[in-house]
C-alpha cells in the first residue's frame, strides 16, 4: 500500500496517478492499495480535507473547481468505480462517499451538503438469497443533480437519483428517483412539496435579516423551474393506441343477458 499526505502530481510503478496543478498539503490522506487508479483535480479546486482510499484497481476520483469554502470528504473508491464532484460543491461537516464494483457516484454543480451525511452506492457487505445464492444488494449508481441541498444527517443509498434544484430534508434516506425542484423528506424520502426553489444566502449571515419573499434575494434563475411530473410527461409522450371494439364478444354478452332476463 502507498500512503500520501499531500495532493500533488504523482505517479507510481503500479500505474496510480494524481493530476493536480495545485498542491494541497494540509489535512490530506491518499491511500493506493491497487493499481491503475487515478485522481484528477481541477486547477481551481478548493479542498478543505480529504481522506481517500483506493481499495482495488481502475478507480477514478474527479474533483471540480470551486470558489467556495473547501469541502470535507471521506471517500472510498473500489474496483472500476468512479466518484465525480462537480463545481462549487460544499460541505458543512464531513461527508462520506463509497463507490465500488464499477458504479459511479456523481455530484453536480453547486451541491450544498450539510453535516453528518453519507452517500453510499453499496452496502459495504454482500447479502445473498439463501435458496438461489444470488446477490440481493448490488451496488448501484448515485446521481445528484445541480444545485441540490442535502440536509443534515441525510443519507443517499444505491439507486438514488435527485433532480436539479431539490432539497432533501434532515435525516432523510434516499434510495430512489426524486424529481427536480421538490422537497423530499422521510425514510424512505417522499416528495412533500413541488415547484420550489432555494438559494444559498444564509437567513442570518446575509442581509436583509428578513426574507419574506423572492424580492429579498437574487434569484439563480436557471434553477427556478417547475417540477417535472414524470408520469404525466411519460403519458403525453405515448402514442395513441387504436383498440378495435370486440364486436363478437359484445354480441355474445348481449345474447347471454337476454336469456337470463327472458327478453
What are these regions (language model features)?
Residues 154-164, 174-175:
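Beta-rich strand-turn-strand
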Residues 1-121, 145-147, 164, 180, ...:
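Domain-scale signature associated with acetyltransferase and cell-envelope carbohydrate enzymes
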Residues 137-143, 156:
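Solenoidal tandem-repeat scaffolds enriched in leucines and small polar residues
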Residues 167, 183-185:
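Short-chain dehydrogenase/reductase
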Residues 129-138:
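Short helix/strand-bridging catalytic loops that position acidic/His residues to coordinate divalent metals
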Amino acid at each position: 500500500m502507498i500512503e500520501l499526505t499531500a495532493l500533488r502530481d504523482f505517479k507510481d510503478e503500479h500505474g496510480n496517478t494524481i493530476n493536480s496543478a495545485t498542491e494541497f498539503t494540509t489535512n490530506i490522506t491518499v491511500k493506493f492499495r491497487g493499481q491503475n487508479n487515478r485522481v484528477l483535480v481541477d486547477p481551481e479546486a478548493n479542498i478543505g480535507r480529504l481522506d481517500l482510499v483506493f481499495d482495488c484497481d481502475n478507480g477514478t476520483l474527479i474533483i471540480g473547481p470551486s470558489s467556495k469554502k473547501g469541502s470535507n470528504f471521506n471517500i472510498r473508491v473500489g474496483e472500476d468505480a468512479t466518484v465525480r464532484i462537480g463545481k462549487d460543491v460544499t460541505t458543512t461537516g464531513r461527508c462520506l462517499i463509497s463507490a465500488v464494483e464499477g458504479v459511479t457516484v456523481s455530484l453536480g454543480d453547486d451541491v450544498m451538503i450539510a453535516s453528518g451525511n453519507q452517500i453510499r452506492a453499496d452496502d459495504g457487505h454482500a447479502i445473498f438469497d439463501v435458496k438461489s445464492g444470488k446477490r440481493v444488494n448490488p451496488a448501484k449508481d448515485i446521481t445528484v443533480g445541480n444545485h441540490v441541498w442535502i440536509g443534515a444527517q441525510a443519507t443517499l443509498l444505491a439507486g438514488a437519483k435527485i433532480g436539479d434544484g431539490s432539497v432533501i430534508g434532515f435525516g432523510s434516506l434516499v434510495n430512489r428517483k426524486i424529481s427536480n425542484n421538490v422537497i423530499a423528506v422521510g425514510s424512505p424520502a417522499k416528495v412533500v412539496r413541488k415547484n420550489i426553489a432555494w438559494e444559498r444566502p444564509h437567513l442570518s449571515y446575509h442581509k436583509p435579516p428578513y426574507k419574506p419573499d423572492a424580492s429579498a434575494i437574487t434569484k439563480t434563475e436557471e434553477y427556478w423551474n417547475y417540477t417535472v411530473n414524470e408520469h404525466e410527461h411519460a403519458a403525453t409522450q405515448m402514442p395513441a393506441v387504436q383498440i378495435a371494439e370486440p364486436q363478437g364478444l359484445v354480441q355474445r354478452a348481449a345474447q347471454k343477458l337476454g336469456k337470463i332476463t327472458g327478453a
